[in-house]
Structure formats: C-alpha cells, structure tokens
A protein has these predicted regions:
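Basic, flexible Lys/Arg- and Gly-enriched helix-loop patches that mediate nucleic-acid binding at interfaces
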Residues: 1-202
Length: 202
C-alpha cells in the first residue's frame, strides 16, 4: 500500500521490512519419549531438534515425556502466552487409553470435578473411543495446561493411563498424515483463528 512506501532524502524506503514479523505457527506430532526441554543432560531427543532452524520458536504449552501428539510452536510470544493462560479457556483434546473398567459414575465424577493437590480440576467433555477388554480409549477435553493434569485426573480414581495423545488444540486438529516428529506450518486462516481466539490482531 501507499502507507508502506515512503521516501526519505530521495531514497525509497520499504516500511514492511521494518514492520513486525508475520505471525507463524507450526504444529509438531511429538513422539512419546521425546522431551520438551531445549537441553538435556542425558542427551535425549528434544522436540526442538525437529523444528526449522530459521525461526525463534516459542512452545505453546508442553507434553510430558511419555505423552505424544499435537504440539504448537509460534514466533509470536504474546500469542503463546495468551494461548497458555488459563483465563483463555482454550480446549485441549486428548485420546487416552485407560486400564480398568470405567463406570458411568466415574465419568460423571471426572466431568463434575476432582480436587487435586494443586486445586480443583475436571474434564469438560468425555467420550468413549472404543477398545476391548481392560484397555479402553476415551477422548477428553481440558481447558488448562496444568502439569500431567489428564493423567492425574484418571489416577485420582485409581485408573492407569497407558497411552496419552493430544489430538486437538483450540480448533487445530492434528492431521492423520503428520508422521511422528514431523512438523508443518499452519495455514494463514488457521493462524488467524488462533489469534482471534485470544483477541490478538494479526
């Protein structure tokens, strides 16, 4: 636009070069056993090993060592902070494989809430995902990013989580064809949707 083009002392200046960097968001399909820290004394693989190196990426939340699935990274620190803040109430959906027979009463309790050591927590939604025998899959939604929150809610009712995979963050779903430890940039309209969800301008 004309506003982006000015002349100073007869020299053409492109203001776009000096404007704030365009917001980028990257999704990664984290594999279980990969850490979310930048450095590790044990030499284990980090999620940062699988990211493009030409950008300073900020991780949006984290997944524990034994969890897998969708992780988001952005070059916009404000966006990362707002997406992580509990007041934003952003949906995080997980596929969870649970060992043990879960009753309707158990599900009601998980939705109504349980007092954990760091305060009250609950699932906003629980749906059955299938499975046979003692191991069954469930899809659960939380709106906070507390450490090991999904596992701790199940463990509070004496159930063991044998697998935990994040499948969705806000309205961003992990594509079926995104392989383990593979990353992919979000499309501009997906980035805009995330910015809108926390009332940030692009």
């Amino acid at each position: 636009t004309i506003a982006d083009k000015v002349t100073i002392d007869g020299r053409f200046i492109d203001l776009k070069r000096y404007s704030e960097e365009e917001t980028k968001v990257l999704m990664l399909n984290k594999q279980a056993g990969v850490i979310c820290s930048n450095k590790d004394e044990e030499g284990r693989k980090s999620v940062f090993d699988f990211l493009p190196e030409n950008t300073r990426w900020v991780m949006v939340g984290r997944l524990d060592l034994n969890s897998a699935g969708l992780l988001l990274f952005t070059n916009n620190g404000d966006l990362a902070n707002k997406l992580m803040h509990p007041s934003s109430e952003i949906d995080r959906e997980y596929a969870v494989r649970v060992l043990g027979r879960v009753s309707d009463e158990d599900i009601k309790q998980l939705i109504s809430g349980i007092e954990l050591e760091d305060g009250f927590a609950k699932f906003h939604k629980v749906t059955i995902g299938g499975g046979d025998g003692a191991n069954r899959w469930y899809h659960v939604v939380v709106r906070e990013g507390r450490k090991r929150e999904v596992r701790r809610l199940w463990e509070a009712l004496d159930f063991k989580v044998s697998r935990l995979i994040r499948t969705r963050f806000s309205d961003i779903r992990m594509p079926d064809n995104l392989r383990a430890n593979q990353s992919e940039l979000l499309k501009p309209k997906q980035v805009q949707s995330l910015l809108n969800s926390v009332n940030l301008l692009p």
